């Protein structure tokens, strides 16, 4: 059958727009076919929204929605509109929508020549929204709206009344708007204006016969939507008020549904209170309302744009949702260390949005999805952080944590280990041969602290074998996994290595170790606090990641090594190992005096020798400890130690610690709770000790070490910081980097405003400025420092012997704390952050502190002290107790010009400058508000700021101080410090700190007085017995010649002479024979009476012995021959009387008197300090004055006592290098050995070049031994090795009487002949030396010959006797009066002699022999070569 071809005219048609809408309705109103959708509908029975599957025709719902939106838009045009009535007559298939308010104008359109109501509702593409220049927030947009409802209705009636014009307009359309009846206009004099639309949908076009329940439910929900999204209206549905006043009420309809759904999901009749879902509502501004709830399924949203229900969301939903997701993600990452993907957060959100958008654009006429760009919204909606924090308190946070944990668990399981026989990924692993095999559970993995410990552990494997032992080194400390993220754990190499090597599987519940490569884990760390911390971190890792593993007895082990070894040399050689410091301290106090011994501190495993490690592994019973399986509340203690959530509990845990509590080293099995409470706690305490100062001196350990080092070095002349730091490190056994010490030194010397009120060190160089708070200090190698003169007035030297000094690394280091004369913690303030504790104490005025100290002395009421900063010119206001506010200084110097001349203390210049520059230039968030800014600083602050008149007015309104950030708070509510007993204490007031300091300081002033009086009493006793000894010698009651040493000592004991120890303390009585022999061997033996090994090694390295307690007779037997003269006898009597008078005067003083004396001296020095500081900051650097060389220790006079501290010192050859003896000097200061009374140095004699330099000598003279040089100082090698033989000693002593007789009989002759001899010597010298004028007065000084002989001698009686006997034997005449030196000594001296003259000023003390260029650095003023 053939068909006729269709013509082109028939194929292409043109239809009217009305026909197009009816033929293609989906373009305008959506589908006209029945569809099943998941929709929220209003359920009348439960009075809430419920989500259910419904069968509706979207097009029918859309034409209903268009009429509702028209009614809602009228609220924007007429804010006085208050009511919308919706009546749905399902049986009649009729719907009515009526709104009050301003109606449609009832007039004929000028251009179209028809009534405006007819044009709007009966003609397509007519609207009042076509002016795009006018920003509108209505729903109508394209000119279709109500016309679409008219087109798809069989009957459409418009009714509008305008009371203002007194008319009512009614018009009817039928048959899909194809029939338009003429309008009926009547008079309207009563009632409000209104607009009403009544229509009957053309159900046949929608494939429907009636309005069923599904479509009615959706329509009713849409009426509720209008009521919730349009503000300040009443909506009635079928004559019933909906009673929804705002968007929040509307959102709550969904809350009931969520609650009911959760009940159904949980199978409960009623949900627990904690499970009730919450909806968080927030009205951001007049155009944005947001509500949030947790979604139980996936992301859900209910949103409205200008009352239009955007069921498909759009840019406005993304705008809000993205903000919430981003901020929640940031919180999870920063605060909770959790990582969750954005879609996982979004899928758990239910968002409600009601907004007004200017000229909104949608994807289609159905308006289900907004497409307007965010920048075109016409308003912004920034979700506040407070709202996000509220969201984080809902179930969303819990779900995110669960999701994150699940993500982490999956990620961590990917890195699980397995039991395999060989692992090749870790080159440093020393794998056990049996690891990963069926015998793997018998193997032990040794985890060592670092590579150095690994080598030692490997050495130990030589003892136990490598079949069942493996080793692996840890790099530093492990990660605290308790709050760590999965990403942190996965990136931690140590944790991943342990899992692989051990074969551990994350979160696996272990009941035995047969599935592991190793069945035991042994920790081998240093025996210090850091080693304990590593053990704790491993325990924390195992407990939190592998449940059940620590329940297996014997799984976790530790290998302990000694922390100190004591080597006993006498009476018998022995070695004692100590595994903790308290045990060592106990032995030192109770047992050490019985032995001669030395100690060795084992800082780490690297200190041990390989042989020692093999010995340790050979005795595993002693060195291997087992951690007991978890019991009781062990898990709680692990959580307490490592959980960040337990910070407050940890603070109390630390506060309750009793000093001296340690883990019992004899325990074979260590309970984990004991380990945490008795060993691990020491690490946390050490952290606090490093960070929080002591209330007595205000120092942290590093600062205390620096001050100790400066005192020990007597740092009176400047020294590079880069040189001082290593010196402090060495002399205080500092175990950390020198760089941190250098920074501490810089901090103690900083003098800019806001730093130290009293800087204890002088800043000779760029030590930082106020610009950056000291961060701009120069490098340590460029700057110098020295002790401030005021420092020793604050830390009085007389207190040094009273402190308890710490013993570390075989040496005495800094004290536990210093006791300044006023509380430096208040003078300079303090701040720091430790474990569980932090502190902030501002500085105060030293003079106010002293005033209150005197109030305490007088039992008077204390005055209130306020924070004070040296050199600061701002003001401080007390706003409430313990709270202050600091203000800078700002003044108006012109109409719109301001001058800032001071900042709040510790607000640095750079901070304010950055703020002002931001105000000058602005950025994306801040507009420029400063017109101009100048800086005119010198040492003081000066900003000149120019504002515009508008900004000046605004600044006045805000406040000058507020706008320029010239206000800073100070709080006294966190004043934490260690109390005198070593416990952390929080102080409630400044006066409480002062009172705590006062009573301890007063007690120590009494101790100082007692100590000084005791030392004076000892000196009186020593002088008394020296007088008695000399008298007995002179009167022949005591003979010491030609007697064995032990016999002399025994006779002295029988005569009641006490021994005096190094400290100057007398010991009466006789120690037992064994101890006496040790004393004599160590302190009194000559070189040939001891075996070579003992004399070379034992006496040199022994640091403790019985002689410390019992002392020796060196104060008698070490006196010079000159001491046996009558003059010396009388002088000793006079010295004894002087000491008795000094003691009597001291006893008259009270502790408060001594303290007041110190305070007065400080006040004088402090005023000088303030003057110098003000001059320095003002640019006038005070003159330090010239330093005088040669001033310092005087020479010993002929008849002064022997100094026992020098006799047994090892002789030191001067090989062109400087000799440093500051350690020994400091020990003398500490012990206050006042054996030599200091006086001014003798007048120096300027001569021609002396014979010792330029005179030609015979070979015999050059080879002859010097009769006056000290063998302990100048000799390169020992001469007269047989000098100590008893026979030779006897021969020397035989000549004592003869020498005494000669000295007595020739004394007058010597006085007469000495000048002549000097003249002869001078004339003789003139034959070989260039003439130089010599002052007659100095040249003729009497007894110069004898003085010179003694000056060059530092020898004992025996050495002087040796000189005299040599002279007697050689029968030398005049030349014997000239001191002779060896060739090396003479050449050494000659090298440093100036060409024009030679001045000789010799010091008998061996620690005075220091070259000139060393003097300033060593704090010694002794000079040998100086021109007058």
From Swiss-Prot:
Assembly state and interactors? Homodimer.
Location in the cell reads:
Nucleus
Q: Where is this region: Interaction with DNA?
A: 333-336, 965-974
Modified residues annotated as Phosphoserine in this record: 1087, 1252, 1266, 1269, 1272, 1353, 1356, 1408, 1423
Q: What function does this protein fulfil?
A: Control of topological states of DNA by transient breakage and subsequent rejoining of DNA strands. Topoisomerase II makes double-strand breaks. Essential during mitosis and meiosis for proper segregation of daughter chromosomes.
Effect seen on changing residue 781 to A: Strongly reduced enzyme activity
CDD domains xref list: HATPase_TopII-like, TOP4c, TopoIIA_Trans_ScTopoIIA, TOPRIM_TopoIIA
What is the recorded phenotype of mutating residue 690 to A? Answer: Loss of enzyme activity
Annotated site, Interaction with DNA, chain positions: 477, 480, 650-651, 700, 734, 740, 908
Q: Where does Mg(2+) 1 bind?
A: 449, 526
Q: Which GO terms describe its molecular function?
A: ATP binding; DNA binding; DNA topoisomerase type II (double strand cut, ATP-hydrolyzing) activity; identical protein binding; metal ion binding
Provide the GO biological process annotations.
chromatin organization; chromatin remodeling at centromere; DNA strand elongation involved in DNA replication; DNA topological change; reciprocal meiotic recombination; regulation of mitotic recombination; replication fork progression beyond termination site; resolution of meiotic recombination intermediates
Which family is annotated? Belongs to the type II topoisomerase family.
Species: Saccharomyces cerevisiae (strain ATCC 204508 / S288c) (Baker's yeast)
Pfam families, A to Z:
DNA_gyraseB, DNA_topoisoIV, HATPase_c, Toprim, TOPRIM_C
Additional observations: In yeast topoisomerase II can substitute topoisomerase I for the relaxing activity.
Q: What is this protein called?
A: DNA topoisomerase 2
Q: In what way is this protein post-translationally modified?
A: Phosphorylation enhances the activity. Stimulates decatenation activity.
* Composition bias type Acidic residues, residue spans: 1403-1428
Annotated Mg(2+) 2 binding sites? 526, 528
Domain annotation Topo IIA-type catalytic: ranges? 692-1159
